[in-house]
């Protein structure tokens, strides 16, 4: 499981709730959350959900909506931010990881300023952003990334 997502959950939630993973990939985070008692739904292009378009779950609203390493790939980034907002319950939390524009190993043009603007325009509150370095130790990678993290509430 994304260790930063786990830390965020441990800080913000006293007990398991409902979560939505936008861009779930191999559904690893979904499986990990289920193991610790969360009710979790994951969607991805692999199961027919195009995040360039609006997605509203039949299981909404969620306590947590998160997306890891998807936003920088999308052309319609405002749509993903709106999808997060529309699937969250009031006072629910979001968590986003993507690559920062300073990352030399990805093709991202995202900055803290731009992402904060998108989030504020959508109506999110308690927004926190940070950029940090992370060593990607996966097979065939072995390099550093600059991660852009955004969290906040509806």
Model regions and ranges:
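Core SAM-dependent methyltransferase catalytic element
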Residues: 137-154
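Conserved class I S-adenosyl-L-methionine
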Residues: 16-25
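A short glycine-rich, Lys/Arg-flanked "PGG" loop and its adjoining helix->strand segment in the class I
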Residues: 78-90
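A conserved beta-strand element that flanks and buttresses the S-adenosyl-L-methionine
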Residues: 66
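Conserved beta-strand signature within the Rossmann-like core of class I S-adenosyl-L-methionine
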Residues: 91-99
